[in-house]
């Protein structure tokens, strides 16, 4: 039996669509994080995030070049999600290619390393794979789709695996 799970995954490519030299977010050596957004015509810009300090909010200040900037207080090691609120319109960071989907919302993400967040990093270990398969359901007399996680090495031996069903 295979380990079965219905899951949502988002792959992340390290693609560079940063605008010139603008870097956001910038995780600093003191575990603060600096956000930047080029919005020369904006009247107000906030960062809305899931860290605890300041209720997860920060107000960016506008620079002469139209780039808004905010640096957080020191953050714990973790994976954080955030979005920008520009004059009441909320969206992801346009120069950060790393995102996470949560049901109907998409968030930009970043990691503050040196602790818990290190567990999110890709490790040099054998990785399994997720396959999308179709099956016929006699109960509803229709074809259904599911995602199946297969551990590394699955199918190469007669080893039996436990089954885990996640329905949501």
Regions found by a protein language model. Name each.
Residues 12-28, 74-140:
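The feature marks proteins involved in alpha-glucan
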Residues 36-77, 87-113, 150:
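Aromatic-rich carbohydrate-binding modules that target alpha-glucans
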Residues 1-13:
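Bacterial Sec-dependent N-terminal signal peptides
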Residues 45-47, 82, 146:
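Short beta-strand elements bearing conserved aromatic residues within extracellular beta-rich modules
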Residues 8-11, 41, 52, 62-64, ...:
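Low-complexity, Gly/Pro
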Residues 31-35:
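Structural beta-strand segments of beta-rich domains
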Residues 146-168:
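Short beta-strand element of the alpha/beta-hydrolase
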């Amino acid at each position: 039996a295979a380990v079965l799970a219905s899951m949502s995954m988002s792959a992340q490519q390290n693609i560079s669509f940063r605008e010139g030299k603008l870097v956001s977010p910038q995780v600093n050596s003191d575990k603060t994080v600096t956000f930047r957004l080029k919005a020369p015509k904006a009247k107000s810009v906030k960062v809305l995030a899931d860290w605890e300090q300041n209720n997860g909010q920060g107000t960016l200040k506008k620079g002469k070049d139209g780039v808004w900037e905010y640096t957080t207080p020191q953050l714990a090691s973790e994976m954080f999600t955030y979005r920008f609120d520009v004059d009441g319109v909320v969206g992801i960071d346009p120069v950060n290619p790393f995102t996470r989907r949560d049901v109907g919302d998409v968030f930009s993400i970043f990691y503050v390393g040196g602790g818990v967040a290190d567990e999110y990093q890709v490790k040099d270990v054998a990785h399994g794979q997720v396959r999308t398969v179709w099956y016929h359901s006699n109960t509803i007399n229709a074809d259904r789709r599911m995602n199946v996680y297969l551990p590394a090495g699955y199918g190469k031996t007669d080893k039996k695996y436990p089954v885990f069903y996640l329905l949501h």
